[in-house]
Curated annotation (Swiss-Prot):
Localization: Plastid, Chloroplast
Annotated family: Belongs to the universal ribosomal protein uS19 family.
Annotated keywords: Chloroplast, Plastid, Ribonucleoprotein, Ribosomal protein, RNA-binding, rRNA-binding
A molecular function GO annotation: rRNA binding
InterPro entries with a match to the protein in the record: Ribosomal_uS19, Ribosomal_uS19_bac-type, Ribosomal_uS19_CS, Ribosomal_uS19_SF
UniProt xrefs under Gene3D superfamilies: 30s Ribosomal Protein S19, Chain A
GO biological process: ribosomal small subunit assembly; translation
Listed NCBIfam families: rpsS_bact
GO cellular component, as recorded: chloroplast; mitochondrial small ribosomal subunit
Protein name: Small ribosomal subunit protein uS19c
Role description: Protein S19 forms a complex with S13 that binds strongly to the 16S ribosomal RNA.
A Pfam family reported for this protein in Swiss-Prot or TrEMBL: Ribosomal_S19
């Protein structure tokens, strides 16, 4: 079920507070977050947010083209190790 246009985008409160605090000070710092479900909003542009992928925090620089997407879209959680090689000797 998709979100309707009349609903506001979800942003975690702790993340929003940190970004507003940095914007008022005019500082740039890496913000760590576990909230992958938060939507990127225009006040986040220019900040670097370290998004947790289940193992570590991956730093992502927010640009204007990312607005409207979720933070989790920019930190992949699975590492593809490649397909298994065809090992006929072990099958015998």
């Amino acid at each position: 079920m998709t979100r309707s246009r009349k609903k506001n985008p979800f942003v975690a409160n702790h993340l929003l507070k940190k970004i507003k605090k940095l914007n008022t000070k005019g500082e740039k710092a890496i913000i760590k977050t576990w909230s992958r479900k938060s939507t990127i909003i225009p006040i986040m542009i220019g900040h670097t947010i370290a998004i947790h992928n289940g193992k570590e925090h991956l730093p992502v620089y927010i640009t204007d083209r990312m607005v409207g997407h979720k933070l989790g879209e920019f930190s992949p959680t699975l590492n593809f190790g490649g397909f298994a090689k065809n090992d006929n000797k072990s099958r015998r």
